[in-house]
A protein has these predicted regions:
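Extended beta-strand/beta-hairpin segments
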Residues: 1-48, 58-80
Length: 80
């Protein structure tokens, strides 16, 4: 389960996963929308999850097939 917590003070949201000791991650919105612009926006976090999934899947197949690589980079962008 994912837990997202926010306070009245600002629009920063803290997200944690209930799988033991994991680091929390945060989201925020731009200053002009009332946030602090201290963390990624929610849409960027969603896009990051997709990019991480693609990156891990690519490396999984490279490892499975015994292909040599130094790193895998995924770049993603979204239109608003």
């Amino acid at each position: 389960m994912i837990t997202v917590t926010g306070t009245r003070e600002n629009y920063i949201a803290e997200m944690t996963a209930d799988r033991g000791t994991l680091n929390a991650t945060h989201c925020d919105i731009p200053v002009e929308q009332g946030g602090q612009n201290a963390y990624m926006r929610p849409g960027e976090t969603l896009l990051s999850a997709l990019g991480a999934c693609m990156n891990i899947t690519a490396r999984k197949y490279l490892n499975r097939d015994g292909l040599d690589y130094e790193s895998v980079t995924v770049k993603a962008e979204m239109a608003r």
